[in-house]
Every structure is written in structure tokens, then in C-alpha cells.
């Protein structure tokens, strides 16, 4: 899904990959809304498995997609997330815990990627409450059943909300540490201190509190 790119290099890249009949390039011309963009992509997708992948994620292990698919094909699984690593080889994501920071947060952030963490949880295939959608695979049937991403959550918590809807529908959400990718997300990204962004973030927090209060309390 193309979203308001401006550089010549990216359009040269699009022309090159468009020669592959397996690739279908579509353009989102509205303002940024992570949930709406992904829902738009799904409407134009044809497969029974969906892969959500941010543009700042790069491959470490070549078999990462096959690894995710093998887990996602299990009858009881609805979604699969991966181990994401910063360029300095510390952990960016090893699953999400509900309640960290008030709503949800990543486990083992900034821990060296070769460490296994408390009870080896950073290195064990396991069920989670949520995983990040920076790299997440879902069954199409599960995605459709839960209604996709909630578009009121334009930036924050949309993946957490989707995962909670998925588990509520009876599926498992699985963290797979054997699929590893780099995530170039800035470790020093500033706070949401723009007034418009602050108000948007507060609305998203309120949405999560209103819709998932029973889970957040526990």
C-alpha cells in the first residue's frame, strides 16, 4: 500500500516490483490512519493469510515468513507476531503485556537480543494477549470475523485492540521468537507533544479504557 511517498527512488522501486504479477500495488491518498490503511489493503488482498508489515522492517532470517505461516496455519491460531530487534541488536518487541504504561507495552525492550529474559519468555513460542502489527500474520477468516482494525484508533493501540478482539473471538495470538526481523523504529522518538497529537492520543487511550476496562483492570 503506497501512502503519499514523494521521492523518485521509491517510485522507481514501485515500477520494478510491479513487473512481478504476484505484486498488486495500491495507493492510499487520504490522511494517515494506520487502521484504515491496513483495512484498505485487506479489501484488495486475495489470500487466506494476511501479513501486516511496516516499511521500516528488514529481514534477518530468510525463513521468517514460512515460520510465521506454519504457526498461523494451526487451527486454533488467529494471529502471529515476531521478535523485532533494533539495529543495535537489542529487543524492540517480544510480545505485548496488557497494562504496561496504562494500556499495553512491549516486553523486554532494550534487552540484548541474545538474552532469553525472565523465565526465557523472550525466546519461547507462546500465547500472548497481543503482538505488534509492525510484523503480524493473521488468518483472513479471523480478521474478517473480528471486523478488522478499529479505525477510531488511527495511530496508537490499534494492534492491541485487534489482538484483544481476536482472543475474545476464541483464537490464540502467538509470539514466535524464531521469526526475527530488524525494526528501524527510532529508540529516541520524541513524545507526542504536538497539541493535535496529544488530543488524538488521549482519545485513543479513552477508547481502550472504555472498550477493554475489564481486561485492563486485571
Regions found by a protein language model. Give the residues of each.
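Active-site acidic Asp-centered loop
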Residues: 2-3, 53-56, 150
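Glycine-rich, basic loop-to-helix element that forms the pyrophosphate-binding segment
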Residues: 28-45, 63
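Short aromatic/hydrophobic "clamp" motif used to bind/position activated sugar donors
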Residues: 50
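Short glycine/serine/threonine-enriched helix-capping/active-site loop
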Residues: 80-83, 176-177, 184
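A short, conserved alpha-helix in the catalytic core of glycosyltransferases
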Residues: 64-68, 122-147, 151-180
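C-terminal, non-catalytic tails of nucleotide-sugar-dependent glycosyltransferases
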Residues: 78, 88, 100-127, 137, ...
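Conserved donor NDP-sugar-binding/catalytic core segment of glycosyltransferases
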Residues: 57-103
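Acidic donor-binding segment of Leloir-type glycosyltransferases
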Residues: 1-31
